[in-house]
Amino acid sequence: MESPLFELNSALSAASSKSEAMLCSISSKGSWPLPEFDPSQIRLIVYQDCERRGRNVLFDSSAKRKIEDVSVSKLCSDAQVRVFGKCCQLKPGGDSSSSLDSSINSSSSFSDAKEQCPKYQGSRCSSDANMLGEMMFGSVAMSYKGSTLKIHQIRSPPQLMLSKVFTARTGSSIYGSLNTLQDSLEFINQDSNTLKPDHSTIMNGLLGNIVHSNPMDMPGREQNEDRDSGIARSASLSSLLITPFPSPGSSFNKSCASSYQRRWRRSQTTSLENGVFPRWSMDESFNLSDDSSGPSPGIVRKKKIAIGVIFSLSRDEDENNKFNEFFFSHFPLFESHMNKLKSAIEQLCLVLLICLMLVFKAMKMSRRSADASQRSLAYNRIVDALNEFRTTICNLYTMPRIGEPVWLTMMSGTPEKNQLCHRFMKEFTFLMENAAKNQFLPALLTAVLTNHLAWVPTVMPNGQPPIRIFLEKHSSQSVDMLAKTHPYNPLWAQLGDLYGAIGSPVRLAKTVVVGKRHDLVQRLLYFLTYFIRCSELQETHLLENGEDEAIVMPGTVITTTLEKGEVEESEYVLVTMHKNRGNLLPKESEEMRTPNCSCKNCKCPISLAQNIEGVSQQEREDAQNTPKVELETSSDESRTIVPDDGQEDAADGHQPRTCQDTKVESVVCTGSSSPEKRVLAESGLEATANMWRNEDVLEAGSQAISATRSPGIAVEKKPPDKLFCDAFPCSAAEAQTKVTFLIGDSMSPDSDIELRSQAVVEQIARHHSPPTAEEGVSADQNCEAKQTVEDQNRDCGTAEPFPQVASEHQSWNPNAYNAEGMSLFDDNFTDDGSVETRTMDDLPGQAAAELLTHNSNLEFSKKLCTKTSKPPSEFCKFMDSVRQETYKNCFAEQDQREKISIRVPHGDRENAEKKVAPGIDWDIPRNESSDSALGDSESEDAGHELTRPSSNYYGGEQEDWAEEYEIPFPGSKLVEVNSVQPSIANFGRSLLGGYCSSYVPDFVLQGIGSDEKLRHCLVSDLSHAVQHPVLDEPIAEAVCIIADTDKWTVQVASSQRRMIDNKLGKEVLVSSLVSNLLHSTLQLYKHNLSPNFCVMHLEDRLQELYFKSKMLSEYLKGQMRVHVKELGVVLGIESSDLPLLAAVASTHSPYVAQILL
């Protein structure tokens, strides 16, 4: 659904219509789903449970009725209203975090007598009140002073309820009868210091001594510390987060220390292995307070308050699933607003106590009239708080988002990176030319880079060339390893990255772009999504419990199974094996047939599974455009190899050998089915009619054929979902091991042609050069089979004689090839279509065979072995001459090579365990955490070394052949990944708002038309963000960047500063480094350099900021105070750059902030 913004863009001037249309397409391509949710679907119900009076409903929004005119009692006279107004207008001095006028109802004036009249009046409670009360209170004992937060799911009618039960220590029934009003007054009078003539002192005493009288036992939590110093001791994670053992950060000086430490501590504080740690929240200090410090237990009445927020869901199941997904993934935000609602109710209780105390003592009014007046006031205030909650939640759920954030789209591995860079540079140029007034864009970017600090880890050096860093977005090896050893919630890490909460002291930042020009605001939002960074998250589903949990990027990962072999786009080459789970894996295709071998010596079918050997990135790219590959197929235990140690065959002097160190995708059976029931899988080659095997080979369970793949298939003509479709089917009668593939492939088949390079052409030419005399293989060195490939469409039952063994190279007869498939690669083949095929390995005296690797877009044909009418007598005779000792000797030789520790079942009668060394070890880069701001990696150089434990297998004595056989490759448990569409359960996309009709406090980035509401609620929002942080950790400061395109100003509002002179915040000091960054990038683009190069230059300049911050941190190490002029003379750092560099340095050197601020 397109937002009205895009419709308005069409009416703009023709000069910018082209670029605006491009921007419109950028946002609409991955458009965010705009659900519908009505505020009336949110219901609030409040209970109290008192020891003496039991449980009763204080408020139920579904049982209220609005009244137009209410006759106010004479007892609620104007004088009384003035008293109420006078009390409620009082504010605490110094700390704005507990401002009553903002938290209760900042939109109304308490001095206005008319507004004190109730607008709503309660009616009879709803029928489900008792049931909901039982659900909310549950079995929580009255003696428990803490708070409980629960989620309830009601099936009929479909509802979700979020409830919070906490202890109220006021000792009075504020909303009910006034029988305990005197108790509450006595309770307040216990503290003689709070009752002074100064009403502001009264309010301060109540809020400070009651609400925050007993903070949690954590150092530096005092509320009276200097919050204006810029360095709050409560912001130091190292001193606040309790850990049962020393933190690794004490000696961890690497550049990613802050990001690493933050995740490590999160793992410790959320792991049950280390005990249960209390969650951090300011309001918990009120609930967890100690009775010993307060008045005597005889006066304090234990009372529990329960707040329930009920979300009425739609009858549409899809809508319900969407909301459930959003609710549970964004639960920290819901909980934060729930706490804000709870605080409003608590503060209202305190205000009513004070007002009733003064009214009761001054006017001597009756209890009944006081009861009526307090009920009316409380009811209206709760309704106001509920309306604010409803509006916030509905806006959070329904407001438009930016369809394709620049950084996240680059992270997603999209093949259109060139186009994406081109679009980004177009928008960048437009903004530099149209938003340069008053240095608006440099000031805005300075503020963003200073506060949204998640960009810092993305530019940290990792030893890779800049082009690879830019194109592949490497991940942090240390953070990846941490995610496996100390798991944490990736959504929590992503949320912290978005808010920029990785520095020290910890700050939460958000950006609001204000302006009436929709197109300009939209462009600025799109531009900023490149600098406000976070990691991309991808939800994965595992077949079974495993240690590794691969998280890979959307749009680049597919899954396929052995039955259907469906393959989608991916950037990874992974192989996993798992048990047969019919509910997760597709059913077997009817087209897949398992032909039996008709060889006279082969008494049983042969089962083949797959092991894709690791190949380098360059080889995978080369293979995408290579028409011919040689595929080595072997049986269940090993590939047949005969070493060149003089053991020659007496009959024809040939020894069968296969290449062990070739960089090909090899077929290795895992022995999931019994050796008496082997089935040879079908492949794209027409081989002999009968399989050949002698008795010794049959005993050893080994056999091999040397096969080559037809070059006549054009890779671009085959869609990805057809690849491997019929290559390796499973037998329906056998409970065989299932194989899951994540095959490397590009997003679009057409891009395969573009990826072809000169290196690929040279590689093809080298492998297809005509054979020479030196390349001839002697009889005791090599044995090769000449095979004739028939047309793909030929029936699988057609007989074809197996060619005789020759000592020269094989040649292919392409007569039956498809002419269209051959046309693409005519230039790379000889006239007769022949190509040399070498099957030598790297044993002593042998030359390593250079075999091309095939990728997923190189399709297999349909058959590997077919029945024939003419038995392959030559091969059968040849195989009979091979002794079993040769295989054992060959494997002994191969044990000296580079290996992957994968043991393959041998299955021979001596139960001899054999080891296969398949060539090149993998370096598959897995962004295991993928939830750092460090990006994702698609290069083998970025992957870390993984320890691959051996999986032992015993062939002859294995009873349960249906047992799972694990090959512990990275990501082996991954079977399903979400679609390419933007996920609603992703903070990275859901909190980057578009042009909104109203201010949304939770959005990290958003655009609005006017700052009227922003001025109205910004102070309370920032205060709430500090008091109830969504990250569940102490926050020193909350800031908001306000960029006004109408006035061309950029200001930063802070929770530590009040608005002065009607200004929302403090003006931003433009950094000269940022200004130079923007202008140098613009000049490069104007000089017709490629957009990719310009974006790379932008990254280099950002990395320069990081290096300067490292230089600053090293200079400040060990110093107490330093002057700005000294930094300019010694380090060449200008005063305008110091705030930015200090913020960047705080991400890796926390002591910098303590020295400079």
Swiss-Prot record:
The keyword Cell membrane does not apply. It comes from the Eukaryota. Residues 651-664, 904-916 have a biased composition (Basic and acidic residues). Residues 95-111 have a biased composition (Low complexity). Residues 92-120, 616-665, 769-796, 904-955 are annotated as: Disordered. GO terms for cellular component: cytoplasm; cytosol; lysosomal membrane. Residues 475-1083 form the cDENN FNIP1/2-type domain. Residues 37-467 form the uDENN FNIP1/2-type domain. The keyword Ligase does not apply. GO terms for molecular function: ATPase inhibitor activity; protein-folding chaperone binding. GO terms for biological process: negative regulation of lysosome organization; positive regulation of TOR signaling; positive regulation of TORC1 signaling. Residues 1093-1148 form the dDENN FNIP1/2-type domain. Pfam families: FNIP_C, FNIP_M, FNIP_N. Keywords: Cytoplasm, Lysosome, Membrane. It is found in: Lysosome membrane; Cytoplasm, Cytosol. Homodimer and homomultimer. Heterodimer and heteromultimer with FNIP2. Component of the lysosomal folliculin complex (LFC). Binding partner of the GTPase-activating protein FLCN: involved in the cellular response to amino acid availability by regulating the non-canonical mTORC1 signaling cascade controlling the MiT/TFE factors TFEB and TFE3. Required to promote FLCN recruitment to lysosomes and interaction with Rag GTPases, leading to activation of the non-canonical mTORC1 signaling. Belongs to the FNIP family. This is Folliculin-interacting protein 1. The gene is FNIP1.
